[in-house]
């Protein structure tokens, strides 16, 4: 029985060999790298169900952060399933050929599945943070656009053989610098004005995100960019960063939101059994002549015009 269980080893690299469209990759993950990807996939999957389970304890109208956070780890679990299966990659000629046997060769496997993951999940991460800070939607959408620039330039740079890849790397770093600025300055101040509990939650999660995200360009530089470390080490490097940036971040964010009403952040969501007031609940018809309360703000708070 023990021999039978031991025989059930990871066979992904045999089923999906290191060849794509007739081109073989020289620098690839080994079984150890695949095993690590499976482990991260498992953590992402368990985290998804945990976040959804925590959401079930909230009213349906208060689950927005649970759904966004669960979506992040759900997408990541699929990406890590793909990479663990030795799929979602393409062989790219390296700019720097190394003598170290772990990174020796001409073609290195580049996991584009990782960038698809980031293209989908990093906007969700930023949405989590910026909605926590109560930032206006135009700012949220603009920061997401800058984030997409960062991810796409990273992918294009990884797929380029020549030194021009570092130009795309520079564009990506500039986009990252702007995102870190928004988190460290504008969003932090906005969250502080919403309330001390919101401010603490944002600082905790925003600081974690800013620090971890700054490490991604370093990983890119020694992996796809410089071909300095082996794909197995690349898997560990990116995997640890993703585990901190997604499930750990998600757990801290939801813990911080446990007593925060989303309505305080401008996220008042109507349930199916609630009445709709097109002009807001405080702008209902005031008399039979159709008079309305025109002294209410957009948030529904009444303002004395003579004050």
From Swiss-Prot:
Transmembrane parts of this sequence: 36-56, 64-84, 118-138, 140-160, 166-186, 202-222, 235-255
One Pfam family linked to the record: Bac_rhodopsin
GO CC term (a single one): endoplasmic reticulum
Compartments (UniProt record): Membrane
Biological process (GO), any one: phototransduction
Residue positions with a glycan: 28, 293
Keywords: Chromophore, Glycoprotein, Membrane, Photoreceptor protein, Receptor, Retinal protein, Sensory transduction, Stress response, Transmembrane, Transmembrane helix
Membrane-related topology note: Multi-pass membrane protein
Family matches, as InterPro entries: Arc/bac/fun_rhodopsins, Rhodopsin_retinal_BS, Yro2-like_7TM
Disruption phenotype: Does not lead to any apparent phenotypic modification, including no change in the photoinduction of carotenoid biosynthesis.
Record's signal peptide: none
Conditions for induction: The expression is subject to photoinduction. Expression is slightly induced after 2 hours of incubation at 42 degrees Celsius.
Biased amino acid composition, Polar residues: 294-307
Gene Ontology molecular function: monoatomic ion channel activity; photoreceptor activity
Region (Disordered): 280-307
Protein family per UniProt: Belongs to the archaeal/bacterial/fungal opsin family.
Known role: Opsin-like protein; part of the car gene cluster that mediates the biosynthesis of neurosporaxanthin, a carboxylic apocarotenoid acting as an essential protective pigments and leading to orange pigmentation. The exact role of carO in carotenoid biosynthesis is not known yet, but it could be involved in the regulation of the pathway by light or other stimuli.
Protein name, UniProt field: Opsin-like protein carO
């Amino acid at each position: 029985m023990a021999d039978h269980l031991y025989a059930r080893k990871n066979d992904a690299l045999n089923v999906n060999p290191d060849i794509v469209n007739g081109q073989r990759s020289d620098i690839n993950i080994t079984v150890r790298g695949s095993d690590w990807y499976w482990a991260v996939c498992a953590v992402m999957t368990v985290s998804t169900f945990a976040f959804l389970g925590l959401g079930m304890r909230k009213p349906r109208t208060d689950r927005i952060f649970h759904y966004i956070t669960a979506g992040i780890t759900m997408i990541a679990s699929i990406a890590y399933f793909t990479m663990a299966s030795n799929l979602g990659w393409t062989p790219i000629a390296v700019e720097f050929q190394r003598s170290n046997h772990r990174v020796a060769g001409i073609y290195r496997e580049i996991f584009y599945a990782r960038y698809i993951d980031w293209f989908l999940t990093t906007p969700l991460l930023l949405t989590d943070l910026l909605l926590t800070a109560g930032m206006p939607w135009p700012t949220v959408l603009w920061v997401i656009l800058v984030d997409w620039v960062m991810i796409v330039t990273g992918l294009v740079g990884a797929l380029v053989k020549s030194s021009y890849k570092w130009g795309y790397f520079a564009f990506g770093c500039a986009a990252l610098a702007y995102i870190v600025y928004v988190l460290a300055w504008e969003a932090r101040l906005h969250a502080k004005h919403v309330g001390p509990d919101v401010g603490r939650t944002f600082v905790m999660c925003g600081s974690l995100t800013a620090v971890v995200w700054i490490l991604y360009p370093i990983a890119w530089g020694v992996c796809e960019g410089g071909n300095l470390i082996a794909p197995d080490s690349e898997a560990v490097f990116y995997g640890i960063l993703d585990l901190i940036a997604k499930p750990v971040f998600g757990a801290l964010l939801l813990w911080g939101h446990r007593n925060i009403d989303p309505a305080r952040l401008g996220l008042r969501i109507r349930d199916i059994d609630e009445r709709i007031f097109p002009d807001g609940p405080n702008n209902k018809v005031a008399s039979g002549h159709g008079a309305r309360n025109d002294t209410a703000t957009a948030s529904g708070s009444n303002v004395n015009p003579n004050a």
